[in-house]
């Protein structure tokens, strides 16, 4: 049985998995679905109407939260603007206090969003990514897998997988510490370093360079190909390295 504080508000149509914990004054709106073991702390609001001026409140949409995710105080997760669809958060995520997820965000498994992170509508975040406190991410941006975003960053471009990013869309190298902790092989790391250099240090249009490198078939690890394939999609453009990093190769050395 899921312990639910008597002051929590859980609307009709909410679905709770086994062993969920709902703390005082949390609000779960109609269409919210929680997996097993989800913890929702005080004053969080899940499934509230999106902050979208043209939204029809009669739209039947929702929010889905994966098993084992922790949602701390005052987190807000808005429901989808589309009928039958949901804003999603994966399993084993940790959303710290005051995080905001706009409508139609898609957050994958094992993501950490630190205090006061703000994701605008339609942002996607890959698995094992960490976003530092106070960072803001523009609508429709894609954030790849295992990205490390520093606190107070302002992100308005797509962030490829496996990188570290700071300040205003500035890539500062590969997230090597995080990748090693995940057990990436030496070969995967070697190819990722080479792919990073090929895309960012060779000059020219990033999408064109990545597409050309992929077509050449020089990279064989799943990780390197995933990095390159990221640049073949998206509409917002891509974050680039700091000049200092580009000049010195910071973040991609052995």
What is each PLM-predicted segment?
Residues 1, 6-7, 37, 43, ...:
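Terminal amphipathic alpha-helical/low-complexity segments used for targeting or macromolecular assembly
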Residues 2-166, 170:
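Structural signal for interior beta-strand "rungs" in well-ordered beta-sheet cores
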């Amino acid at each position: 049985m899921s312990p639910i504080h008597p002051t929590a508000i859980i609307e009709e149509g909410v679905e709770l998995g086994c062993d969920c914990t709902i703390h005082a004054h949390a609000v779960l709106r109609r269409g919210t679905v929680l997996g097993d073991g989800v913890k929702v702390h005080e004053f969080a609001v899940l499934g509230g109407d999106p902050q979208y001026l043209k939204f029809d409140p009669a739209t039947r949409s929702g929010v889905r939260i994966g098993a084992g995710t922790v949602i701390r105080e005052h987190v807000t997760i808005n429901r989808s603007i589309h009928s039958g669809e949901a804003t999603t958060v994966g399993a084993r995520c940790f959303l710290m206090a005051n995080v905001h997820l706009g409508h139609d965000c898609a957050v994958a498994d094992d993501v950490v969003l630190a205090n006061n992170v703000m994701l605008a509508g339609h942002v996607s975040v890959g698995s094992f990514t960490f976003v530092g406190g106070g960072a803001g991410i523009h609508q429709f941006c894609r954030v790849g897998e295992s990205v490390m975003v520093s606190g107070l960053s302002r992100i308005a471009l797509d962030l490829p997988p496996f990188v570290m990013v700071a300040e205003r869309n500035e890539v500062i190298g590969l997230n090597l510490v995080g990748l090693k902790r995940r057990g990436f092989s030496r070969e995967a790391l070697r190819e990722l370093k080479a792919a990073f250099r090929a895309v960012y240090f060779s000059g020219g249009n990033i999408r064109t360079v990545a597409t050309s490198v992929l077509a050449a078939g020089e990279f064989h690890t799943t990780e390197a190909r995933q990095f390159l394939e990221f640049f073949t999609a998206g509409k917002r453009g891509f974050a680039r390295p700091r000049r200092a990093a580009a000049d010195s190769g910071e973040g991609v050395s052995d």
